[in-house]
């Protein structure tokens, strides 16, 4: 039996369904929301081979006409070129304003598809069916859509809410271990922001979650989605406290950009390191006990998440000044200053604009120098 959460945004409110077996029931759950019984499904080559038939059979049973497109997997797909080709495919399929777009995949597919839906015919409805832990607990909820540019990650996009989110816990069993761990970093984030009891629960049950325990996975996804739904309902456009959800992401986006969005560092892995850097900076500024940084590092290390910078492809090396240069492109820059998400301890994140450049550079230099 699935659990249902609500994102309370007035006339744009929507439900998040979390549970097992949702993919086979997707057609029945989607049908009442459709202006016309027609959807356009966007997925990637990985999900096509694993789950697309199940979704299409469910849509067929519900009498929903379905077309779609299959894109290459990976962060490189989240760019202008693929946005253009996706919009062309939607127009070639004669999508109308009554056609609902279904994002069926991980964060890349969800972000790209949501952005395409927001601009196609000046906005058509879309539904999220996230297939990774990262997308189930984070990117599918809240309406952030977008693509990457050569200047940085997610710098072109829109706030555009889905009509429904279906998070089927069963599909997580087909994730590669590295992908599952990458998503787990975003789960940890919710404990670090304002839920120390959840972080303590993760210390006890995180390994079971990664090893396939359905109860642990369901609890983690529900807790994470509930936390994000509360924040989004209170601050949809990130004018204030929603920025707390970016804990670790200012550092992470710099790491990803400098790493070329390649296989050296997945998004969740960058977030894991970024959260450690944020806690490290907080400790150096005298804001956070060093014991909390050590506790976070121990937990991430115990679950095989990175606690040091990985080697880059041959011919490239990490550089603290190069990493710092990416901070100026962060979406949280205001009047030329970055708003950092720091912490007074586990479960005590807060926003801070009074951070010295030299302090940030010192953190980056130490991390680059680590073996």
Predicted regions and their residues:
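Active-site segments that bind and position negatively charged phosphate/pyrophosphate groups
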Residues: 201, 205-321
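A glycine/threonine-rich phosphate-anchoring loop and its flanking beta-alpha core
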Residues: 17, 115-208
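Short glycine/serine/threonine-rich phosphate/pyrophosphate-binding segments
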Residues: 108-115, 136-137, 254
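C-terminal charged capping/lid subdomain of soluble metabolic enzymes
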Residues: 3-5, 185-187, 287-371
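Solvent-exposed alpha-helices and their adjacent loops that cap or buttress functional pockets
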Residues: 8, 33-34, 94-96, 119-121, ...
């Amino acid at each position: 039996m699935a659990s249902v959460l609500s994102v309370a945004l007035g006339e744009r409110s929507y439900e998040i369904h979390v549970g097992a077996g949702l993919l086979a029931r997707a057609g029945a759950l989607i049908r009442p929301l459709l202006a016309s019984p027609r959807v356009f499904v966007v997925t990637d080559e990985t999900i096509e081979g694993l789950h697309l038939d199940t979704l299409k059979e469910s849509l067929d049973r519900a009498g929903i006409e379905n077309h779609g497109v299959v894109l290459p997997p990976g962060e490189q797909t989240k760019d202008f070129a693929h946005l253009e080709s996706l919009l062309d495919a939607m127009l070639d399929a004669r999508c109308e304003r009554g056609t609902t777009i279904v994002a069926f995949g991980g964060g890349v597919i969800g972000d790209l598809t949501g952005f395409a839906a927001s601009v196609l015919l000046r906005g058509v409805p879309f539904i999220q069916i996230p297939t990774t832990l990262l997308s189930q607990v984070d990117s599918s909820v809240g309406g952030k859509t977008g693509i990457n540019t050569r200047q940085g990650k997610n710098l072109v996009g829109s706030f555009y809410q889905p009509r429904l989110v279906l998070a089927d816990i069963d599909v997580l069993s087909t994730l590669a271990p590295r992908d599952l761990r990458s998503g787990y970093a975003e789960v940890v984030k919710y404990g670090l922001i304002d839920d120390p009891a959840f972080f303590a629960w993760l210390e006890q049950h995180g390994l079971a979650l990664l090893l396939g325990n359905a109860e642990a996975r369901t609890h983690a996804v529900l807790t994470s989605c509930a936390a994000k739904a509360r924040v989004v309902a209170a601050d949809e456009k990130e004018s204030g406290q929603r920025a707390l959800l970016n804990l670790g992401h200012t550092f992470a986006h710099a790491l990803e950009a400098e790493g070329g969005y390649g296989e050296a560092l997945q998004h969740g892995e960058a977030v894991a390191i970024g959260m450690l850097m944020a806690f490290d900076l907080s400790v150096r500024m005298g804001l956070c006990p060093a014991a909390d940084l050590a506790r976070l590092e121990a937990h991430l290390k115990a679950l095989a998440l990175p606690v040091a910078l990985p080697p880059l492809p041959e011919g490239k090396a990490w550089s603290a000044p190069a990493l710092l240069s990416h901070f100026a492109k962060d979406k949280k820059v205001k009047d030329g200053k970055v708003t950092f998400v720091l912490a007074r301890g586990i479960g005590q994140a807060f926003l801070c604009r009074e951070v010295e450049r030299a302090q940030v550079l010192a953190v980056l230099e130490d991390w680059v120098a680590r073996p």
